[in-house]
């Protein structure tokens, strides 16, 4: 028995606790500190008091993609274990701009942009989380009332030297790239959120580790039990190289049409498919391992890619939508034209092919249109277009760009 008067009683690590710990650790990058978190789980089980699990997201864009759902899936698993999930919308911290992973100052958003983005954020997140078991908070609740006096007192709790331990700040400092003072406030304000919420566990991407540790340190200074931190891997985009990002065009939005979502998922490499299974699928690890063994034994990996795509489409739409998306995909793979393509009427024949593709909404720019023609990705009524200077005469025809973009065009003089 410990003679340390500050030591905490140890709670028994039961099979229930071991199961909860295994669920928590699935697919994570790092859990700090695992022994502490096991004790938090054990205490929760013994006292029947749920843990407070925090996830903060700044509404920097209106749409959520599959990359965001990696951490949301983990939150849902923790909800299903009976814990309280706090979905924190960073309406105050968005005004500062998160510098994590940046090599230059991130421009802060306006309050109007933040409010507009925040409207759709939780509605999309609720496609993953259990709405009835989710506590929604805004960090302006406690950050705005701090005022200048409170902000200065908070800033006194951390040093510039500690801030410069963060890799992205260090690189910018050593490279002579400016770091604005307000950027140092971001980790502090995120950390103060944990104090305000008395969080037991905070989740984030691997690029958030420093900020999460600041929260742990501030809780100690405020006399609270320190939160554990759990970092989730950053999901690679469809290219399998860079992290999924709307700005890079390698993303799958959770509000996309079922056919588009299905087609994008079927386009990933066989190697990336297993990564998506691990981070996005709700199937057991044993089942995924069995699938992998069957693929290595000669079964077509496409079979498993279809399972993955259908599971994800069904989650965000419905099982019926997933079945229809598979039918549509197979139809297109055989050279067929989908039934639900948009009809577009254009004028100005004869019209340059680049302009036609742009005006039909099939490409964002004429330069993108010409790139697709160079790559053999443009078809009119099934015939590949190779002439970038083509002028298209008046008529009605089906135009295709890539595997998934179609339009039924009526072109007049």
From Swiss-Prot:
GO terms for biological process: tyrosyl-tRNA aminoacylation. Pfam families: S4, tRNA-synt_1b. GO terms for molecular function: ATP binding; RNA binding; tyrosine-tRNA ligase activity. It catalyses: tRNA(Tyr) + L-tyrosine + ATP = L-tyrosyl-tRNA(Tyr) + AMP + diphosphate + H(+). Gene3D superfamilies: HUPs, RNA-binding S4 domain, Tyrosyl-Transfer RNA Synthetase. This is Tyrosine--tRNA ligase. Its EC number is 6.1.1.1. Its main location: cytoplasm. Belongs to the class-I aminoacyl-tRNA synthetase family. TyrS type 2 subfamily. It is an enzyme of class 6 (ligase). Homodimer. One of its GO terms (cellular component) is cytosol. NCBIfam families: tyrS (TIGR00234). It comes from the Bacteria. A motif ('KMSKS' region) lies at residues 243-247. Residues 351-411 form the S4 RNA-binding domain. ATP binds at residue 246. A motif ('HIGH' region) lies at residues 59-68. Catalyzes the attachment of tyrosine to tRNA(Tyr) in a two-step reaction: tyrosine is first activated by ATP to form Tyr-AMP and then transferred to the acceptor end of tRNA(Tyr). It comes from Burkholderia pseudomallei (strain 1710b). Keywords: Aminoacyl-tRNA synthetase, ATP-binding, Cytoplasm, Ligase, Nucleotide-binding, Protein biosynthesis, RNA-binding. The keyword Nucleus does not apply. Disulfide bonds: none annotated. It is found in: Cytoplasm. CDD domains: S4, TyrRS_core.
């Amino acid at each position: 028995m410990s003679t340390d008067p500050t030591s905490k009683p140890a709670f028994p690590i039961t099979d229930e606790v071991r199961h909860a710990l295994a669920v928590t650790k699935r697919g994570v990058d790092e859990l700090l500190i695992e022994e502490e978190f096991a004790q938090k789980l054990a205490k929760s089980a013994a006292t029947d008091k749920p843990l407070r699990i925090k996830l903060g997201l700044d509404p920097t864009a209106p749409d959520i993609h599959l990359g965001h759902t990696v951490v949301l899936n983990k939150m849902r698993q923790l909800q299903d274990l009976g814990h309280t999930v706090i979905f924190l919308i960073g309406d105050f911290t968005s005004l500062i701009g998160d510098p994590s992973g940046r090599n230059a100052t991130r421009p802060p958003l306006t309050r109007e942009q933040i409010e507009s983005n925040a409207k759709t954020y939780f509605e999309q997140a609720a496609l993953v989380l259990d709405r009835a078991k989710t506590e929604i908070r805004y960090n302006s609740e406690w950050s705005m009332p701090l005022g200048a006096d409170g902000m200065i007192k908070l800033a006194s709790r951390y040093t510039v030297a500690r801030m410069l331990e963060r890799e992205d700040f260090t690189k910018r400092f050593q490279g002579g790239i400016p770091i604005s003072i307000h950027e140092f406030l971001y980790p502090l304000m995120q950390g103060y959120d944990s104090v305000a919420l008395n969080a037991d566990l905070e989740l984030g991407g691997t690029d958030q580790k420093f900020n999460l540790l600041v929260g742990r340190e501030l809780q100690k200074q405020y006399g609270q039990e320190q939160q554990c931190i759990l970092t989730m891997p950053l999901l690679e985009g469809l290219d399998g190289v860079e992290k999924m990002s709307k700005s890079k065009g390698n993303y799958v939005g959770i509000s996309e049409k079922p056919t588009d979502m299905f087609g994008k998922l079927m386009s990933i490499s066989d190697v990336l498919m297993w990564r998506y299974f691990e981070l996005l699928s709700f199937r057991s690890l044993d089942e995924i391992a069995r699938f992998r063994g069957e693929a290595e034994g000669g079964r077509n990996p496409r079979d498993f890619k279809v399972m993955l795509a259908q599971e994800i489409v069904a989650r965000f739409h419905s099982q019926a939508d997933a079945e229809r998306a598979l039918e549509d995909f197979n139809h297109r793979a055989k050279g067929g034209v989908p039934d639900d393509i948009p009809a577009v009427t254009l004028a100005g024949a004869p019209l340059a092919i680049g302009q036609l593709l742009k005006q039909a909404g099939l490409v964002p720019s004429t330069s993108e249109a010409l790139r697709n023609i160079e790559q053999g990705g443009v078809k009119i009524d099934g015939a590949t277009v190779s002439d970038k200077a083509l002028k298209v005469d008046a008529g009605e025809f089906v135009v295709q760009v890539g595997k998934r973009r179609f339009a039924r065009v009526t072109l007049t003089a």
